[in-house]
Amino acid sequence: MRKRISAIIMTLFMVFMSCNNGGPELKSDEVAKSDGTVLDLAKISKKIKDAVEFAASVKEIETLVKSIDELAKTIGQKLTKDTGVLAADANNNNGGLIAGVYGIVTDVGTKLDGLLKVNGISEDIKTKINDSKSKGTAFLSKVKGDDDLCKKDATDAHAKNAIDKNDNTGGKGKTELIALNTAIDELLKAANEAVEAAIKELTAPVKAEKPSQNN
């Protein structure tokens, strides 16, 4: 994200260097391109800033969702005292792990609700947020309605059926979790595209002048 912000600052600098103040009188936050196009830098800069902040919020949500993959790797394992090494645990105590994942997806839903309140987001992005919310809700409904998962001694097999995307059986949340991942990926892609679109307002090429028709 820091690299992106640095690139934006450099872009703004290049715009200042490439624009001139000729032609009509300009306001303090305006510059004119050589073709006469007037850019409102304050407005465009805010648009870029808002888009970058929104994309960062989506990235935070994506990181939460992807963290479930790491948690799935700890199914059937326990921490070894002193060494901190993960070792096999044959006691099938995965209820706490399932509860943790449930909490993460619940938090994801709350954060998605917050994104819907952001001013100025496109209808396409709103649709993708709502799609992500529905996918998260479907996962939560699947998990909380399963007797095999809602207990302390949830088995390794059942836990994998729920939160391991590589599990061959599934049936307890895996399909819904994959759908949530896909929806969040699409939302992040759209958010990044919004940043690129905002930047392009600064970097759009100058319109070529049409050749004169007079002889």
UniProtKB/Swiss-Prot annotation:
Q: Where do we find N-palmitoyl cysteine lipid attachment?
A: 19
Residue ranges annotated as coiled coil are: none
| Subcellular localization, as worded in the UniProt entry | Cell outer membrane
Topology of this chain in the membrane: Lipid-anchor
The UniProt keywords, alphabetically, are: Cell outer membrane, Lipoprotein, Membrane, Palmitate, Plasmid, Signal
Record's Gene Ontology CC terms? cell outer membrane
Q: What is its main location?
A: membrane
Q: Where does the record locate the signal sequence feature? A: 1-18
UniProt superkingdom: Bacteria
Lipid-attached positions, S-diacylglycerol cysteine: 19
Q: What does this protein do?
A: The Vlp and Vsp proteins are antigenically distinct proteins, only one vlp or vsp gene is transcriptionally active at any one time. Switching between these genes is a mechanism of host immune response evasion.
Protein family membership: Belongs to the variable small protein (Vsp) family.
Task: Write the protein's name.
Answer: Variable small protein 2
Q: What is the lineage of its organism?
A: Bacteria, Pseudomonadati, Spirochaetota, Spirochaetia, Spirochaetales
